[in-house]
Amino acid sequence: MFDINLIRKDIATTKEKMLNKKVPSNLFDQIFDLDVLVRSLMQQEQNLNAKKNQLSKEIGILAKNKDPKLQQTLDLVNNIKNELQDISLTLSNKQDELNKLLLVIPNMPDDSVPIGNDENDNVEIKKVFKPKKFDFLPLAHWDLAVKNKLIDFDKSTKITGSRFIIYTNFGARLYRALQQFCLDMNVKAGFSEIWAPVIVNQESLIGSGNLPKFADDLFKLENSNYYLSPTAEVQLTNLHRNEILKASDLPLYYTALTPCFRSEAGSAGRDVRGVIRQHQFHKVELVKLCKPEDSFKELESMTRQAESILEALELPYRRIVLCTGDLGFSSAKTYDLEVWLPSYNAYKEISSCSNCTNFQARRAKIRYKETIDATTELVHTLNGSSLAIDRLWAAIVENYQQEDGSINIPKVLKKYIY
């Protein structure tokens, strides 16, 4: 959730920074005015309660002494109670209104994030491995999949519909091998493996920042408070929702493999062939919880972890830093890793590593204490793909194809495929 103290302290600077993230300035004026009203109502409520409590003490004395002012004081207390009911109702409504506005405002971008409008203004940091030059015309992964019977597109459409995949034969074994390889790499790097439910509740999605703003991107289970999770970031981030952690337990590192479900609203006509954009896909996720002063260092090491998998597989990739206009809702800073796909003659996103600072922690109430007597502070949360399995599968198939259409595989995968 957006930190309202930023608006209270310096609304002008907040407006300027958030305009770079395409948030209209008048929204902050609304929040500022509502906040002033809410705090005024809270003060009125507090004053009236204090007055009521004082009069209640006096009533006992007046009754004991049979003072003629007793009835007048009783009437006054009843009037205060009625006034308190009205104020409490108004306060509750205005607090809800304020919270709803705060829930749809994205995280503030870090000062190190380049200012820009969209993906065209993202900044390339580095490239690793040059794209392979083939001595033949390389095939796209969807053509290689048909040629080698790695995917059955027709049956997946028959069973479910468009944007779903059935991997078969060697294609299925490669898919499984990539999942295990990514998990093994993450566990060896110190991440604790979690096997989590794929159905999550509304509170978890609010905590991660997916709700209420991105409801159209989610699959909701009818007549329930349950959703199919769009990413294991949701489950892993919410492991410690409504908890106060010990500072000595931080940082916490988690990794999980889950199927992910997205409606891909607004993606009609994009990446219609192959496995790049699906309603259901598998992803290995990383999540970190840490102290605020460590979060940007943790972002660098998380991104390096995802890169190490691409490097072990010897896949050409590049790292970019997202500009303010392309930054995700919950993120203060994001690195994208893009793998080279010959079929696109371009780099395509395969990992997104983000520092969400205290944005998710505020929504999910994840805090920590340095000592028992210390005040609580919000942790910082980070998340990253390590990696998106379907896109990784496509990258292996395309970059390791042979002239006869067969698929070689990286040496590090050979022990996983039998």
UniProtKB/Swiss-Prot annotation:
EC number(s) on file: 6.1.1.11
InterPro entries the UniProt entry points to: aa-tRNA-synt_IIb, aa-tRNA-synth_II, aa-tRNA-synth_II/BPL/LPL, Ser-tRNA-ligase_type_1, Ser-tRNA-synth_1_N, SerRS_1_N_sf, SerRS_core, tRNA-bd_arm
Biological processes per GO annotation: selenocysteine biosynthetic process; seryl-tRNA aminoacylation
CDD domains the record matches: SerRS_core
Catalysed reaction, written as an equation: tRNA(Ser) + L-serine + ATP = L-seryl-tRNA(Ser) + AMP + diphosphate + H(+); tRNA(Sec) + L-serine + ATP = L-seryl-tRNA(Sec) + AMP + diphosphate + H(+)
Top-level taxon of origin: Bacteria
Principal EC category: ligase
Keywords: Aminoacyl-tRNA synthetase, ATP-binding, Cytoplasm, Ligase, Nucleotide-binding, Protein biosynthesis
Places the protein is found: Cytoplasm
Sequence positions that bind ATP: 262-264, 349-352
Gene3D superfamilies: Bira Bifunctional Protein, Domain 2, Serine-tRNA synthetase, tRNA binding domain
Any Gene Ontology CC annotation: cytoplasm
Residues annotated for L-serine binding in this entry: 231-233, 285, 385
One Pfam match: tRNA-synt_2b
Major location (coarse): cytoplasm
Pathway given in the UniProt record: Aminoacyl-tRNA biosynthesis; selenocysteinyl-tRNA(Sec) biosynthesis; L-seryl-tRNA(Sec) from L-serine and tRNA(Sec): step 1/1
Gene Ontology terms, MF aspect: ATP binding; serine-tRNA ligase activity
Domain remark from Swiss-Prot or TrEMBL: Consists of two distinct domains, a catalytic core and a N-terminal extension that is involved in tRNA binding.
Sequence similarity: Belongs to the class-II aminoacyl-tRNA synthetase family. Type-1 seryl-tRNA synthetase subfamily.
Function: Catalyzes the attachment of serine to tRNA(Ser). Is also able to aminoacylate tRNA(Sec) with serine, to form the misacylated tRNA L-seryl-tRNA(Sec), which will be further converted into selenocysteinyl-tRNA(Sec).
Subunit structure: Homodimer. The tRNA molecule binds across the dimer.
Protein name: Serine--tRNA ligase
